[in-house]
Amino acid sequence: MDKIIKSISETGSFRAFVLDSTQTVKTAQEKHQTLSSSTVALGRTLIANQILAANQKGDSKITVKVIGDSSFGHIISVADTKGHVKGYIQNTGVDIKKTATGEVLVGPFMGNGHFVTIIDYGTGNPYTSTTPLITGEIGEDFAYYLTESEQTPSAVGLNVLLDEEDKVKVAGGFMVQALPGASEEEIARYEKRLQEMPAISTLLAAEDPSDALLSAIYGDEGYKRLSEDSLSFQCDCSKDRFESALMSLPNTDLQDMIDQDHGAEIICQFCQTRYQFSEDDLKGIINDKA
């Protein structure tokens, strides 16, 4: 089961979130049939949004858009505060690796663009923030967003490891933030430790990735686990929701679907679920609008 662990240093000067998002990204890959680079890019975006959502309260919904002008197109993710996330990538077929090492490439093929967040508090006035993509690797872009938009210096690591068949093996990440009152000495100590910590791919490959991440972040310093919550890929689409969308169309469009297509099929972008509407369904929608 995927999980996010929230923790704080014994001194109260730093906090860290660590995530095991393996099943989340596996589900996304299965639903969208993504190839290697697209899988890693989508997975990192989902993990970033899981971190953002874990930092919100109430019934907020958080949308993350990674908008590049190169191979991937747009990557869209929506998360809630209950641990659910969904998402899709426009180009599912990007599959580019370094010849010598087999490393899956993301950043060089993201292009120029923006990291956009939309936080909907349910009040009708969502908060939108846009920062430029710095590297296109998504983790660094997310850290830059946190520093620039939320004014919180943050260290972030996100990654997705694939097996020999390019299927998701393990996925996860971390976020470390200095809290008000952290001394310059403490900040320097954490910065040094984070710079020297093993690659996140190495930590995720450990027997217990969450423990490996926490140990690398805190080293010999004490810390307290504040909470552990479950995470999952879950889409909230439904036939009723798409029926409402059809009701917003002009009757002439609905009649064309009846006359020309003898029905309609709608595919959810976020989870690829297919919804069928028969001729009778469409006639019923027209009648309901009358």
Curated annotation (Swiss-Prot):
Disulfide bonds: 235-237, 268-271
InterPro entries: Heat_shock_Hsp33, Heat_shock_Hsp33_C, Heat_shock_Hsp33_N
GO molecular function: protein folding chaperone; unfolded protein binding
GO cellular component: cytoplasm
GO biological process assignments: protein refolding
CDD domains: Hsp33
Keyword rRNA-binding tagged: no
Keywords: Chaperone, Cytoplasm, Disulfide bond, Redox-active center, Stress response, Zinc
Post-translational modifications reported in the UniProt record: Under oxidizing conditions two disulfide bonds are formed involving the reactive cysteines. Under reducing conditions zinc is bound to the reactive cysteines and the protein is inactive.
Subcellular localization: Cytoplasm
Main location (coarse class): cytoplasm
Record function comment: Redox regulated molecular chaperone. Protects both thermally unfolding and oxidatively damaged proteins from irreversible aggregation. Plays an important role in the bacterial defense system toward oxidative stress.
Family, per entry: Belongs to the HSP33 family.
Protein name: 33 kDa chaperonin
